[in-house]
Amino acid sequence: MGAAGVIVLVITLLLGGCGFGAVQIAPYEPEPGTSGACAALSEGLPDVVSDAVRRDTEPAVPYVAAWGDPAVVLRCGVPLPAEYGPDSRLLEVDGIGWLPVDGEGGTFFTAADRAVHVEVAVPDDYAPEADVLADLAPAILDALPARNA
């Protein structure tokens, strides 16, 4: 295969999500009043997070995004998790306060200091998880104001 063929193959893989099918997501309804902010966030999300290429989701909805395999999954307009309380210690990554909650095979991070909450499920394969959160921070900061702003 010549150089042009390799370039076409690489572009095809990048645009096609590296050949992975769509990420199956559990349907949910975003919190009332969050759809506009979530749509704005979706517009600004990066194509690559921690070297993982963005993938389609099934169903395709504007408040969910996914990258890589295993998939990093972002859900916008979620409620704060039950683990959140007034004394919760947040993990600060690039200007966003995240509440980490351990799950099977990874960690769920919720942007608890935003007016609209975002959850990012990060599989253990992506350690350090802060790299994923740092890649998402600019889009979140642009689209979602701080909770008390």
Regions found by a protein language model. Give the residues of each.
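Sec-dependent bacterial lipoprotein signal peptides
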Residues: 1-16
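Generic alpha-helical structural element
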Residues: 7, 27-30, 34, 125, ...
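Bacterial signal peptide processing site
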Residues: 18-22
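A short small-residue
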Residues: 24-25, 120
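N-terminal secretory signal peptides
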Residues: 26-75
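Mature extracytoplasmic domains of secretory-pathway proteins
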Residues: 49-51, 61-102
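Extracytosolic low-complexity repeat regions of secreted or lipid-anchored proteins
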Residues: 85-149
